[in-house]
Each structure stands twice: as C-alpha cells, then as structure tokens.
C-alpha cells in the first residue's frame, strides 16, 4: 500500500524464481497495474492492463480449485478490472467484470465461509453498486444485481476489525484505506473524518496511498487545513508511482482557504497529469482564483478552457462544464461555498449573512443561498435553523434542474431519521427521489434509497 511499485515488481521477480509454482504473483501483478492506472489513467497503460488481466485470469483458471485462493484471486482481479474499466467509461465490459467478481467471491463464501479475505471484495461490490455512474448502473442492472450501501459498508467495517490481528492481518491496511475512501465517497457523514484518522493510525507513514486517502477524506469532510498538512508531508522519491492527483487535491484545499497560490497546484497537476479526469474542474478552479482577485482576463480565459479542454466523464468535470456554461456565482456566494467546503463555517456564515437575497436575481443563486445556509447551520449544530433553510430550498427548487433542493430534502430526511421521526424521514427521502435534478442525481438518489432501506 506504499505505492512503491518498482520495488514490488522486483520482489515478484524474486518470488517467481524461488517458488515457480506460486500463482499469487499473478494477483499481485494485477495490483501493480491497478494502482498504476488509479494514479495515472494513461490510455496505453489501460490497453496493456486489459490484455494482461485476461492472461492472468487464464493462468489462474487452471489452478487448484480446492483452495480458497482459486476463486479469491480471480474475483479480486475481476473487481479491479471493473473499477478501472468504469473509470475509462467501458461500462458494458465493466459490468461483466462485476458479474464475474460477484460469482467468484460469492461462490468462495459458500465453500469457505471462514475465509476472511473474501469479505472486503464482497462488501465493496454491495456498497458501490448504487454509486455507479448511470451508464454502468444500467449495464449492471441488466445482470440482475442490487446494491445496499449500508450493508456493504458494515461488512467491510466488520472485516477490517477482524483483520487487525491473526493470519490475514497483512490485509488490514488495504481494508482500512478502501473503507475510508468508499465511505467518504458515497455517504455524507461528518463522522467519516474521525473514523478515517482512527483507522489509519497504524498504517505506515511512508504509505503514499495513506496520504492520498486521508487528504481526500479531509477535503470531503471540511478539514482543508488537515488536507494541506498531510499532502505537504506526503512521502516523496523516485521509488513512488507518479501521482499528479495529489497536487489537484492540494489545489482544492488551498482554494478553499482562498490562498493566493492555489492556482500553482492546479497548473502543476495539469502539467504532470496524463489522465482523463479533473482537467475541466482544474481550469474552473483556476478561474475561481482569478475571479476572486478580479482578474477578468484570466477568469474568462480559464472558463473557455473548461469548455474546450479535458473530458466530461467524472461528475466533477461534468459539473465544471455546467458551471462554465452558466457562469460562476456571485462573489460572496462563491466565497461562502469555498469557506464551507474548507470547514471554515463561521467565515462562510459571515459571507452569506452579508447578502440580501433580493439582490440575487438568478434562480440558481437564490437556491444556493438558501441551501448553503442550511448546510452551514447543520455543520454548526444549529439543527432548527438548518431545517428551516432546507425547507425553503426544497420548496423553492422542487422543479429545478439544480441539485440544491434535492440535497436539501436528503439532509432533512437524515435529520428526521437521526431524531427517530421515521414518518417525516420517509417522506423526505421519497421527495428527494421524485425530484428531477440534473446535477449529482445518481449519488443523491443512492443515499435516499439507502435511507429508505434502513427504515424497512
């Protein structure tokens, strides 16, 4: 998990020479390719990965069927293949990899119910399905698979705790990092940060993947100062796989703080990045930086690059393109949004309370104002105020294409659920699902469906 992939390759060469009949290096070779693509997203690496993955599966298929490692190794390779193929928009092929992974891991569970390594992959499959992009969700849906985020995360959490000791303890780091990343990506809970920090305490400080996951989770949960500290202190050296996305995360953290050097991190990412994700979003955030210092030329120029450069594959890049076409929000709203994202809630509230809502003429701006006040008050544990503004956002934006009303309904439902008012919670989860927002719909709807499942 340190992402010292060159050293890993050398160890696998040594293992093959010393134990030529051992098939586990086939799985570990796939890990190396998997992490290379997660950090780099290069098309040439992807083409090689698909070819090599199939060769590895062919070799594993003639192994010892009486061993739990027979199904496990094939299931893990299929699962890694599914995640990478989904990243490259190869949805139908990814769907078949998911089907094969599910078969191998479930079959193994039936034959070897005490084989703990299976549970990470099984939990991951169950949790992730609902958060798949629409194209992949459609493809997998034809294969008859269903999701349950809560059930999947619970299985991963139970597995991680059991991996803290015993003969499979070497899998703890992987389990803790995957769980922290997945939980933060598909559930919206302030507890995700503390959970991540606690899980990762025992992981080697020289793990580049650890730095990435903690930085990512810190950003997702409003801890930009922590993200900056962790990413600045990350291990460096030629032994590590190139990971340009770490500079992208640093840029977001610095922009949330409205630091004057935020753009330098995005430019570094754009220079070193060879992948397909976050190019549009980087140019949008460079435009934000210019906008905040009233550099009209740089602002307009980078908005044009949002439209002309990169790909609209990831949700962040799709949203960046929408915003570039619509125009950036009024400056106080943008400052409030960035401050909120960074965890600077009092500062965010000050920006918003200085705004007269009547001065906001566009529907999107008014909805964001109401919604953002709800989010800030919820973060400040002022629940009644949060619910008031969530209701206003929901009522004003119920037929809007923007995500504010739907996410407001989702948060109202979660508040009612926490208060054990399940009748109101169900109503707002259903209202959330009925809305026709065009932004972040898959992720919002998945959380609403999962909320309804919890109350059955």
Locations of the language-model features?
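Residue-level recognition of tetratricopeptide repeat
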Residues: 31, 38, 76, 83, ...
